[in-house]
């Protein structure tokens, strides 16, 4: 009976000592949190291993994350994974569609995003761009002649239209002189002419008798305007004037209309401020609805795919610029010792328990072996 009691005692003591030793060793990883002094003498193994080496642990964790966890190869594989890409595209389509279907006005949406004075800025920007474009256009075209500035098609149309313009002018002239107003104007012109010639009117009156001068001149004027020769003459005159105009510099226009006036006229016609205001007062849905399907089905997938491709090609540079090792190091360094202990224990709790149990098991086995040795030695 004493033999079995001795074996049980040695086994139990060995298990208790082995289990408690491992439990104490685990506790000493974290505790005490601060060094303990007896007078000026620091007690050995204080503070615990992890509190003592926390800064080194932070550095090593940062290196481990960068070198073994968040590697360019691992992230690159994830970004090129077909299922991941499909999921990301679907998520992006859903989120973009929510924005597109928003019934709030663009103005309200921009205010929510803290984008202030957008209307004034957009108006000024558009007016600035228009002004710059007009001035650049004028600066270029002022170096040309009209023949160089006008498109060839316009030149052809003008030249083809000259005979028609001549015919139109003559037709309007005939219609005018056939009217009472035209006859009156012609009569006044004749009277003014003879008034400046003195007795010439009396001499003409002797030849014409009772018929007025205007009645004789009016048919001749109309006849003259209706002749083909007159039409050709006017056409030739217009053609010569057109050729002269084509040879003149466009810059001559500046003496009649200043650049600032042209810019001001264009801006007034465009009504930029009014247009921008109307645009911003529209809802997001109204603005995007005409192109909604294109955005969802084409733009979003294309943008996501290109973004992932760019990310894959530049993942190493991105990770380097993020300085992940420093981020992890800084975060771990800010942890209190208690939080760091809780973090490690939450991950390794079961394993540490098993280490304690293993210590008890080994201690029990050693105690049992000791008991057996004592038995045989007796």
Swiss-Prot record:
Organism: Bacillus cereus (strain G9842)
Cysteines paired by S-S bonds: none
Family: Belongs to the UPF0754 family.
Taxonomic lineage of the native organism: Bacteria, Bacillati, Bacillota, Bacilli, Bacillales
Name listed for the protein in its UniProt record: UPF0754 membrane protein BCG9842_B4423
Gene Ontology cellular component list: plasma membrane
Subcellular location: Cell membrane
PANTHER family linked: UPF0754 MEMBRANE PROTEIN YHEB
Keywords, comma-separated and alphabetical: Cell membrane, Membrane, Transmembrane, Transmembrane helix
Segments passing through the bilayer: 357-377
Keyword Phosphoprotein recorded: no
Membrane topology note: Single-pass membrane protein
């Amino acid at each position: 009976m004493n033999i079995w009691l001795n074996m049980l005692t040695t086994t139990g003591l060995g298990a208790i000592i082995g289990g408690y030793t491992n439990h104490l060793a685990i506790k000493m990883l974290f505790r005490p949190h601060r060094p303990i002094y007896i007078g000026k003498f620091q007690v050995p193994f204080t503070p615990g291993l992890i509190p003592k080496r926390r800064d080194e642990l932070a550095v090593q964790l940062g290196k481990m994350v960068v070198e073994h966890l968040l590697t360019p190869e691992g992230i690159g594989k994830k970004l090129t994974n077909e299922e991941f890409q499909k999921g990301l595209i679907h998520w992006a389509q859903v989120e973009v569609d929510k924005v597109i279907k928003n019934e709030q006005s663009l103005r309200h949406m921009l205010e929510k995003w803290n984008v202030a004075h957008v209307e004034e800025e957009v108006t000024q920007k558009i007016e600035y761009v228009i002004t710059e474009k007009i001035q650049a256009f004028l600066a270029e075209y002022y170096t040309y002649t009209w023949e160089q500035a006008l498109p060839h098609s316009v030149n052809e149309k003008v030249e083809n239209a000259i005979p028609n313009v001549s015919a139109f002018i003559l037709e309007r002239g005939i219609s005018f002189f056939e009217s009472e107003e035209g006859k009156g104007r012609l009569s006044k012109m004749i009277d003014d002419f003879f008034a400046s010639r003195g007795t010439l009117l009396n001499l003409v009156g002797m030849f014409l008798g009772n018929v007025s001068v205007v009645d004789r001149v009016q048919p001749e004027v109309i006849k003259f305007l209706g002749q083909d020769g007159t039409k050709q003459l006017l056409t030739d005159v217009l053609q010569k004037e057109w050729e002269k105009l084509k040879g003149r510099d466009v810059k001559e226009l500046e003496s009649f209309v200043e650049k600032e006036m042209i810019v001001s006229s264009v801006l007034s016609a465009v009504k930029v401020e009014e247009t921008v205001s109307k645009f911003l007062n529209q809802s997001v849905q109204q603005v995007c609805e005409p192109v909604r399907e294109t955005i969802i089905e084409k733009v979003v997938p294309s943008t996501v795919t290109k973004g992932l491709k760019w990310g894959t090609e530049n993942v190493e540079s991105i990770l380097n610029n993020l300085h992940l090792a420093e981020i992890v190091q800084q975060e771990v360094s800010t942890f209190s010792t208690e939080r760091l202990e809780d973090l490690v224990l939450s991950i390794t709790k079961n394993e540490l328990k098993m280490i304690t149990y293993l210590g008890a098991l080994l201690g029990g086995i050693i105690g049992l072996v000791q008991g057996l040795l004592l038995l045989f030695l007796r």
